[in-house]
């Protein structure tokens, strides 16, 4: 009897020691098992900056959600200027007799607008119109004036024949199919008055080229440097585009999260691995600037045309980013529209390439580009993740996501 109790007592005591040790590990252990509330976890908005869709004012309530909230995108205003300069440079060296198709002394163009409530679209529209002297103080598709521009040493009057927001039948913006339909209508309506086509992005530009009656040889400009657009430049179908350095953006999104998850604070969050080498020896090759007032990291833009398109061919990844030995962390990332050409063909592949190098286990959920609920309904099981990256359907929906992180 004594032997029986003695043996079992040892087991009980041993079990108690194990349980006590486990409790100690949970309550006093290292940061790996420390419970962090969702509201305190790193949050990065990317590609679609939280802002008012009418005024363009940055939504600082969302940006100040916590001390670990940032935005990663590109220099929208600078990008609009780059696209405008790309167009001006092309026209300056062009033959006016070729550009002015009907010889009326007028350069007529049509404009594909992505989303009148999106800061990037607004900036690109402004850059285009400033370059062509048709800017009238507003990015509104209908608020425009006549201008003038140098074409091969000759001054031509410039008329925006029509500007239109490309909204699909499902309500989605930046819609390539809508651009195809619009171009078909424009070609019929304006005929040889159309001397140039300009688009807020490559997806819509490529959509225009899909129109069966697209006027052959008419120059067309896009924006994003998507793979199909780059190939179209090489084939002579697209005249030019703008690279917003998608690899720099995707890597910066992941790098900021990595820095925050590694416990970095202050300026180290937006410089380590971005403008200076991080502890793993990584540094993004392309320039990325930090704007303190809006907590935004912005990649710089560059023009792409027939003289340099081969530099931007798909598959050229940033060699400055190498495999790290950092602890693996889980990140939940939303994509506002699974059908968005830039995100699906360029941004998401870049994320999927760099995330494993930074030891980030990325879970991507995608929306329909129309309803915020298509993303938010998948923004779930938040306690299973160490950080979040958000790409909203509407730029003023930041609070819809942060409300989910309160609990």
Where are the predicted features?
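Extracytoplasmic "Venus flytrap"
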Residues: 29-35, 113-122, 196-199, 330-350, ...
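Flexible loop/hinge segments that line or gate small-molecule binding clefts
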Residues: 35-78, 97-108, 226-234, 238-239, ...
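Hinge/cleft segment of the Venus flytrap/periplasmic-binding protein
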Residues: 103-108, 112-116, 120, 132, ...
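Positively charged n-region of N-terminal signal peptides that target proteins for export
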Residues: 2-12
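Hydrophobic alpha-helical
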Residues: 32-39, 128, 149-152, 157-231, ...
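C-terminal motif of bacterial Sec signal peptides marking the signal peptidase cleavage site
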Residues: 24-27
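Short, solvent-exposed amphipathic alpha-helices that sit
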Residues: 79-83, 119-159, 178, 182, ...
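Hydrophobic alpha-helical segments within soluble ligand-binding/sensing domains
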Residues: 64, 70-104, 123, 176-180, ...
């Amino acid at each position: 009897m004594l032997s029986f109790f003695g043996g079992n007592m040892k087991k009980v005591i041993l079990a108690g020691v194990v349980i006590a040790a486990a409790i100690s590990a949970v309550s006093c252990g290292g940061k790996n098992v420390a419970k962090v509330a969702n509201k305190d976890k790193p949050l990065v908005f990317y590609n679609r900056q939280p802002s008012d869709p009418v005024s363009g004012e940055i939504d600082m309530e969302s940006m100040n959600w916590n001390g670990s909230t940032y935005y990663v995108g590109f220099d929208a205003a600078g990008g609009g200027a780059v696209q405008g300069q790309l167009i001006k440079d092309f026209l300056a060296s062009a033959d006016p007799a070729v550009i002015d198709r009907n010889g009326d002394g007028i350069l007529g163009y049509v404009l594909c607008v992505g989303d009148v409530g999106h800061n990037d679209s607004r900036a690109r529209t402004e850059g285009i119109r400033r370059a062509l002297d048709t800017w009238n103080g507003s990015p509104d598709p209908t608020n425009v004036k006549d201008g003038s521009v140098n074409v091969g040493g000759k001054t031509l009057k410039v008329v925006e024949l029509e500007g239109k927001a490309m909204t699909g039948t499902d309500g989605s913006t930046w819609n390539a199919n809508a651009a195809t339909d619009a171009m078909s209508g424009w070609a019929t309506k304006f005929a040889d008055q159309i001397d140039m086509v300009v688009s807020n992005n490559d997806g819509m530009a490529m959509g225009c080229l899909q129109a069966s009656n697209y006027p052959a040889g008419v120059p067309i400009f896009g924006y994003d440097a998507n793979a199909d657009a780059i190939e179209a430049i090489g084939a002579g179908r697209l005249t030019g585009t703008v690279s917003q350095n998608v690899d720099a953006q995707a890597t910066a999104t992941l790098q900021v999260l990595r820095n925050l998850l590694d416990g970095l604070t202050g300026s180290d969050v937006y410089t380590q691995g971005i403008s200076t080498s991080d502890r793993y020896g990584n540094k993004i090759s392309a320039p990325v600037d930090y704007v303190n007032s809006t907590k935004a990291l912005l990649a710089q833009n560059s023009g792409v045309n027939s003289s340099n398109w081969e530099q931007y061919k798909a598959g050229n990844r940033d060699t400055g980013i190498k495999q790290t030995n950092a602890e693996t962390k889980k990140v939940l990332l939303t994509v506002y529209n699974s059908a968005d050409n830039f995100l699906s063909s360029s941004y998401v592949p870049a994320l999927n390439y760099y995330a494993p190098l930074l030891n980030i286990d990325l879970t991507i959920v995608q929306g329909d580009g129309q309803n915020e609920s298509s993303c938010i309904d998948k923004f779930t099981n938040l306690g299973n993740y160490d950080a979040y990256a958000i790409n909203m359907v509407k730029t003023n929906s930041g609070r819809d996501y942060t409300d989910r992180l309160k609990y």
